[in-house]
Swiss-Prot record:
Chief location bin: cytoplasm
Knob domain: annotated segments: 565-664
Cell compartments where the protein resides: Cytoplasm
Taxonomic path: Eukaryota, Fungi, Dikarya, Ascomycota, Pezizomycotina
Biased composition (Low complexity): 115-131
Zinc finger (C3H1-type): 27-56
Transmembrane segments: none
PROSITE patterns cross-referenced by the UniProt entry: PROTEIN_KINASE_DOM, ZF_C3H1
Name by which UniProt lists this protein: PAN2-PAN3 deadenylation complex subunit PAN3
Region annotation (Disordered) ranges: 1-27, 54-134
Keywords of this entry: ATP-binding, Coiled coil, Cytoplasm, Metal-binding, mRNA processing, Nucleotide-binding, Zinc, Zinc-finger
Positions annotated to bind ATP: R317, D366, Y367, H368, P369, L370, S371, K372, T373, S425, K426
């Protein structure tokens, strides 16, 4: 009987909530028309269609009907179909023991089941709530939003991104909240924290989505990547790479190596003094061994020497046979030490010496290896091909020279000094179209007793500046002996703007108008932009070349770690440093990277394979590789992530003291 009653109850429940039966024509007004469902409208709605064409009315009617069936207060309370008392015989319980094994005897005294949304029935004639109204026992404000652990609330201000730093985070805009909460969720659960895993689809569809800078969730920079930094001027395809893309360009590398070799060059078995004050290892830099005293009034020689104070290399200019008569003369060099300009060779010191078996004046300046003078570069001075005609200097190069010399004169004149020497043989060409004024402080010491005003000396600098440009444009060192012919040649070769600028400089001593370097720079301001743009392009090129060497230093450090760990003879008998563990993987990984052979047994020398393996090791990727021992008896399948972890743990073990390493 119990079984029959239970099955009947379940059958009634299934009929109450199951699929509706087929309705007849009398219920057609409560049935939604199929044309509305399929096409959105019914063309026979006004022509006698008996079905309902209002979907909202049908849904509301169906929901109210189902609520009456499921949440009726007159529904009978749930009671078990079979109740066993404590005094029942075992025989009567044996038939239903298996079915009732999970029901506690205390269930008989339990209160009848009622939905929480329905209040208890009272004797009062007026009910407290309407039967069809649901009062939820919880609200949205009481449900705390999921926030991942470790989420820093300090980033909420940056996530808001509206620039109002003074607005509290509880009242500011939250890009992860889908809709405003009318139940005051901020007051119910405390400060609102942004949920990075929530998506505001409604705001995205309405065009109001807010994407802030999520600095708290950014991945770390992948330093193992070779980022191609511009400019790019190669003609290879997108998938093609060559070895030169990973290192410095050959011309730049050769130039820097030659400069390094010239800096470290020594001259054994020389007759030069071994020590000049605090300098040693002197090497002569003059190409012409004939004495020339036309510029300074004394024969001068240039040497490269190394300082005993800081170990750096400097250029020493020696004035032979100079006798210092006034101590204040050499003190004038102190003002030149404060001149710091990229177009002026820096002066560091000046002193007298008898190391050359005479009385000499020594000037200490910066050393620029493999530098030439403008006379050697353009005027054929020191050229072994004496019969070859000098090449014409392009106007753009001359404008570059004028810009750099004007920059140097502006810095010198601003320091209340005068260059006094602007000669092709005393201007260094240290790079491609890169010049520096040299030997500027010498005349202040040599001609200290000659009294000339500073304004007159600065005007003379402008005249010497103009004569230098005319000399370079004519490609003749003695062209200024005939100024009229020189200017005719200069006018035919260059534009009127350059000619007018040179005329203005040559008339620098005339007092018809004010002339200084600032006025000259203002007059050539249009051409300064071209020179400045060229300097920016050179800076971009050097930055691009430098970026190629950025990752090479990282790979060297990685290979250094590998060699620190692999095959250490002092730990051969240490059980904690056995090569049967993770360090054995590193040993055969080194063979996998550097000691591969082809099918014929010949060594494989593949730089691309080495760089690829080391980059993957540094990144710790999940890619797995097969490592085979040297005797080909063991095979291991490991990932780069496991190899990186083994390398780091082994290297950290090396840094520990020997006592702690034995304990671990």
């Amino acid at each position: 009987m119990a079984t029959t009653g239970k099955s009947a109850t379940l059958e009634d429940a299934r009929h109450g909530t199951g699929s509706p039966k087929m309705k007849g024509r009398e219920n057609a007004k409560d049935t939604l028309c199929r044309n509305v469902t399929i096409y959105g409208r019914c063309r026979y709605e006004d022509k006698g269609c008996a079905f309902n064409h209002d979907p909202h009315k049908v849904n509301s009617g169906y929901q109210s009907d189902s609520n009456k069936k499921r949440l009726n207060v007159d529904s009978p309370s749930f009671t078990p179909s079979i109740l066993s008392s404590n005094g029942s015989s075992p025989t009567s319980q044996s038939a239903t023991m298996k079915k009732m094994a999970t029901i506690s005897p205390k269930a008989a005294s339990a209160a009848p089941f009622q939905p929480r949304s329905i209040s208890s029935r009272s004797n009062s004639s007026t009910p407290t709530t309407r039967p069809g109204t649901m009062t939820p026992d919880w609200s949205v404000a009481e449900v705390q939003e999921f926030v991942p652990q470790g989420f820093d609330t300090a980033h909420i201000g940056s996530l808001q991104g509206n620039g109002t730093a003074g607005v509290p985070s509880t009242s500011a805009f939250d890009p992860f909240v889908t809709a405003p909460n009318p139940l005051s969720a901020a007051n119910a659960v405390g400060p609102v924290q942004a949920n990075p895993f929530s998506h505001d689809t409604a705001a995205a569809l309405n065009g109001a989505a807010f994407f802030a800078n999520q600095s708290g969730f950014q991945q770390p920079v992948q330093y193992h990547m070779y980022a191609p930094i511009g400019p790019h001027s190669q003609n290879t395809l997108g998938y093609q790479r060559n070895v030169h893309d990973l290192f410095l360009p050959n011309d730049l590398r050769e130039e820097m190596q030659k400069k390094a070799a010239a800096t470290l060059q020594t001259l054994p078995n020389t007759q030069l003094p071994a020590q000049v004050d605090y300098f040693h290892s002197l090497v002569p830099l003059d190409l012409n061994h004939q004495k020339n005293a036309t510029i300074f009034g004394f024969p001068s020689w240039v040497y490269k020497a190394q300082s005993s104070k800081d170990g750096n290399f400097y250029a020493l200019r020696r004035l032979e046979g100079f006798r210092l008569t006034n101590e204040k003369a050499i003190r004038s060099v102190q003002a030149w030490k404060r001149v710091c300009n990229g177009s002026v060779v820096t002066v560091h010191d000046a002193f007298t010496s008898r190391s050359f078996q005479d009385s000499s004046l020594i000037f200490v300046t910066d050393y620029h290896p493999l530098s030439k003078t403008l006379a050697e570069q353009h005027l054929g001075a020191g050229n072994r091909f004496q019969g070859r005609h000098n090449t014409h200097i392009p106007e753009q190069v001359l404008w570059g020279y004028m810009t750099q010399i004007a920059n140097a004169l502006k810095a010198i004149h601003a320091s209340q000094l005068a260059a006094r020497i602007i000669d092709p043989s005393k201007i260094l060409l240290t790079g491609r179209n890169r010049i520096r004024l040299n030997a500027c402080a010498i005349m202040d010491v040599v001609q200290f007793d000659t009294q000339r005003s500073l304004a007159e000396l600065q005007r003379q600098d402008l005249v010497n500046f103009g004569q230098l440009i005319v000399t370079l444009g004519a490609n003749q060192p003695n062209v200024m002996h005939n100024p009229t012919k020189a200017m005719e040649h200069f006018t035919r070769a260059y534009t009127a703007q350059l000619k007018n600028s040179v005329f203005w400089l040559l008339n620098g001593l005339q007092k018809d108008q004010e002339r200084n370097i600032d006025i000259f720079i203002t007059g050539i301001s249009s051409t300064l932009m071209s020179t400045f743009d060229s300097a920016l392009h050179l800076d971009d090129q050097l930055t691009s070349d430098l970026s190629r060497e950025l990752e090479n230093g990282r790979l060297v450090r990685l290979m250094t770690k590998l060699n620190f760990v692999n095959e250490r003879p002092e730990y051969e008998h240490d059980r904690q440093w056995s090569e049967n563990g993770e360090r054995y993987f590193l040993k055969i990984f080194r063979d996998y990277v550097f000691h591969q052979v082809d099918a014929q047994g010949d060594p494989v020398v593949d730089l691309g394979h080495v760089l690829m393996c080391l980059n993957k090791l540094d990144a710790g990727t999940d890619e797995k590789i097969t490592l085979i021992s040297r005797d080909e008896q063991s095979c291991f399948v490991v990932s780069y992530k496991e190899l990186k972890k083994a390398l780091e743990s082994s290297f950290q073990a090396l840094l520990k003291p020997s006592a702690s390493r034995r304990l671990h």
